Amino acid sequence: MACSEFSFHMPSLEELAEVLQKGLTDNFADVQVSVVDCPDLTKEPFTFPVRGICGQTRIAEVGGVPYLLPLVNKKKVYDLNEIAKVIKLPGAFILGAGAGPFQTLGFNSEFMPIVQTASEHNQPVNGSYFAHKNPADGACLLEKYSQKYHDFGCALLANLFASEGQPGKVIEVQAKRRTGELNFVSCMRQTLEEHYGDKPVGMGGTFIVQKGKVKAHIMPAEFSSCPLNSDEAVNKWLHFYEMKAPLVCLPVFVSKDPGLDLRLEHTHFFSHHGEGGHYHYDTTPDTVEYLGYFSPAQFLYRIDQPKETHAFGRD
């Protein structure tokens, strides 16, 4: 599998906290950004298979939207244990956003990878979720992957944040009451882009929508048989929902593309009340509350980059 490697700009956590504090204040009424010890992510509401998001951090972008649109390329299937080896971190803890492994499921879905990959001494642990539209009533159907399936697949496209899964220092972000137009992730990403310019910074981690509701989408179970050639066509194909807090989100974002055809931000989420999907923005600016834990990435790995590309379907 072809792979390009890039070293991110890595400011100190303290500097990043200061930059994010300033930028988020333009978009939220109440903002507190600080450097803290990562909370134990094995506990509720996260229930991850590891305690933290620290140690040898990297971002992997695998495949891309051109393998889904305008028409699906069903040859593009991946394995998260193999991806961990490609990014030189066997045993990595991987979280993020991608397309579900249709090669196993038999249909298309939104995928929330949460995987402790295989290493020399440890068996892999799959804490992933997938979301699809319930054919019976049109509602979201969120399922824990390992309750039915035992592989570590994903497909088509994935934006992944990987680490050793260790405890350590992270950036805690609390933001309440949105006053600007940007969603939580876009605000952080654009703040970093404005501050660091041509020095790309990559970040990942997890955040909770503690209060409020969000606009979300779930892809149809059937891939489109007619070509989807614009954002408008894609939006007609997708199923949109409003979903309620608390939601556990898995963001991956990069301040600026270093010329590797990146999807600059991508966030999927799950919950313990049966809702999950692709995060767009909150729909309750007056009441929304976000609490997140983030770590900067040292390296970027661009895996199986599409040779033919386009700019739609990346929202």
UniProtKB/Swiss-Prot annotation:
Binding positions for Zn(2+) per the UniProt entry? 266, 268, 278
What InterPro entries would the database entry show? C11orf54_DUF1907
Q: Which cofactor does it need?
A: Zn(2+)
Q: Which GO terms describe its cellular component?
A: cytoplasm; nuclear body
What's the main place this protein lives? nucleus
KW Cytoplasm (keyword) present: yes
Q: Which GO terms describe its biological process?
A: DNA damage response; regulation of DNA repair
| Alphabetic keyword roster | Cytoplasm, Hydrolase, Metal-binding, Nucleus, Zinc
The molecular function terms in GO held by this entry are: hydrolase activity, acting on ester bonds; zinc ion binding
Which residue stretches, if any, does this entry annotate as coiled coil?
A: none
Subcellular location per UniProt equals:
Nucleus; Cytoplasm
The protein's Enzyme Commission number = 3.1.-.-
- Superkingdom is Eukaryota
- Assembly information from the UniProt record: Monomer.
Q: What does this protein do?
A: Exhibits ester hydrolase activity on the substrate p-nitrophenyl acetate, in vitro. Regulates DNA damage and repair by regulating HIF1A degradation via chaperone-mediated autophagy (CMA).
Q: What is the protein's name according to its record? A: Ester hydrolase C11orf54 homolog
Organism whose genome encodes this protein: Mus musculus (Mouse)
Origin organism lineage: Eukaryota, Metazoa, Chordata, Craniata, Vertebrata
